[in-house]
Amino acid sequence: MGDALGRPAEGSRTPRFGPAWPISDYQRWPGYQGGRVGTITDDTQLTIVVAECLLTNGCLDPEDLARRLVVWLPDGRGKGVATTQAVQRLTAGIPWYLAGEDSAGNGAAMRAAPIGLLRHAHTGQLRAEAVLSALPTHRNPMAAAGAVAMAAATAWLLGCQPGTCVSSALVTAIQAAIVGLEKEPQPERRPPGRLTTLHDRLGELPALLEQQPEQVLSYLYNGAYVLESVPAALYCFMRSPDDMEQSLLLAANAGYDADSVAAMAGTLGGALGGEAALPQRLLPELEYREELLALADDLWQKALEVG
């Protein structure tokens, strides 16, 4: 849902914030790999790939994931550079543990939520499988940390009731899950280019909730870099944890990597509120709506089976 909303604004360098959102509904997006209103992008496509890998194997099997990525590539929509290059190597026969790019892009983070759903009661397995899920395309430690962060956030929110989400507690849980994964700080992409870690940037989020969205998202810079997009998605969610529509619209209208940030923000809202949290007016035109709901139900049943 988030990527379908945000795709027309992806790459926009002129963020627009409420109260009158320029993007308030699905829009047809023209050009390369354009689609009708409600069309999903690689964010949802790859989340489906991971979910189906988990359902088939009962765990994250990286060899199976690699095969599925190869099948996905020709029909991938809005593919990221690192993911594309890595899957091209997989297609050429390079093993999954050697194919990944040394990239801290968000291609692993945006597809990791199903691991949080399956392993919500098993922190160690969650962390290990989220790291494994990143490696076929992203071997950078920050990319792995981003995948663990999104899986851990999903798992933590599944244990909360709507109306009870405490932002500082969520951030603390994510930080605990990713501690030790980042070998060294990495630079911000915008001046002053300070060195920092995802762990530390996430720690800034509770205080940032006191500021206006345009200030915060200008500071976080919601691009495709894990250091930008994962905190931005969490911010959009935490600003309106019980109103998924507002989270999605904030992320979609912020431009830059709008589809991925909105997709991740929506994932978090869904983990907290379930199907009831989905904006009902956006469901009818959402591509693969029934398949996505069924897949989520199947994965939850699998999670209950494995305990």
Annotate the PLM regions.
Residues 1-307:
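Structured, active/binding-site neighborhoods that engage oxygen-rich ligands
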